[in-house]
């Protein structure tokens, strides 16, 4: 699959830790999930998935509780899920997922980030068809064969199971997130190094060193926007 998930998560967490941006993003996502359904994760599948993802980033309990309490308290703040698609240099493709309380603010900010950093926004659907919605799990302490056996016994289908730097990485269809995680937990997995819902590129491209530097600047500009939750792309950054 070309991506070292533990490295990517650690790099992202390291980048965001100084500003607590990652905590703020999870706080927003938890609030939205809790407000759209029940504030109890046992009866709200979407909320449970967000909380499981937040756990792998060590999001403080206080932030989680505050977001859920805000939803319980009947806050009238509403957010919209938005997806933008675009292109970077040399055939690179980018998907930007945002969660915003002001649609009129977000679109111009995303467009400006593209335009100022050598990219351009495309129309809806222009690149998403080249990505697959994917659940990704990372775990340690078991071999890929042991993980495969656990999943087979639970009758849960996955796309691939790989070993990476002492960890096992499991790829599955996005809608299988809960089924895969429950099967692994029932099979004795107590902690996950990675638990993500992502858009995985069907094919990756490589860029020359100078072009990659420009591309990374574009990705940084998009990720630095407050309304942006996730940025996906099809470039092999050598991580």
Swiss-Prot record:
One of its GO terms (cellular component) is cytosol. Keywords: Cytoplasm, DNA-binding, Transcription, Transcription regulation. GO terms for biological process: regulation of DNA-templated transcription. GO terms for molecular function: DNA binding. It is found in: Cytoplasm. InterPro entries: Integrase-like_N (IPR017856), TACO1_YebC-like_2nd/3rd_dom (IPR048300), TACO1_YebC_N (IPR049083), Transcrip_reg_TACO1-like (IPR002876), Transcrip_reg_TACO1-like_dom3 (IPR026564), Transcrip_reg_TACO1_YeeN (IPR026562), YebC-like (IPR029072). The keyword Transcription applies. It comes from the Bacteria. Belongs to the TACO1 family. YeeN subfamily. This is Probable transcriptional regulatory protein BBR47_14810. It comes from Brevibacillus brevis (strain 47 / JCM 6285 / NBRC 100599).
């Amino acid at each position: 699959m070309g991506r070292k998930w533990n490295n990517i998560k650690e790099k992202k967490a390291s980048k965001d830790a100084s500003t607590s941006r990652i905590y703020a993003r999870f706080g927003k996502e938890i609030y939205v999930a809790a407000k759209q359904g029940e504030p109890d994760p046992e009866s709200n599948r979407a909320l449970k998935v967000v909380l499981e993802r937040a756990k792998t980033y060590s999001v403080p309990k206080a932030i989680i509780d505050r977001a859920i309490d805000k939803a319980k308290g009947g806050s009238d703040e509403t957010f919209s899920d938005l997806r933008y698609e675009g292109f970077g240099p040399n055939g690179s493709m980018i998907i930007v997922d945002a969660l915003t309380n002001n649609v009129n603010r977000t679109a111009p900010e995303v467009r400006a980030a593209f335009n100022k950093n050598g990219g351009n926004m495309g129309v809806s659907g222009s690149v998403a068809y080249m990505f697959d919605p994917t659940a990704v799990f990372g775990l340690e302490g078991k071999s890929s064969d042991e993980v495969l056996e656990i999943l087979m016994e639970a009758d849960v289908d996955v796309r691939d199971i790989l070993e990476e730097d002492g960890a096992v990485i499991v790829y599955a269809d996005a809608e299988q997130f809960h089924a895969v995680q429950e099967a692994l937990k029932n099979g004795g997995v107590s902690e996950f190094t990675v638990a993500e819902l992502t858009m995985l590129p069907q094919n990756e491209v490589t860029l020359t060193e100078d072009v990659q530097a420009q591309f990374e600047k574009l990705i940084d500009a998009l990720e630095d926007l407050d309304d942006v939750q996730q940025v996906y792309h099809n470039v092999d950054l050598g991580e």
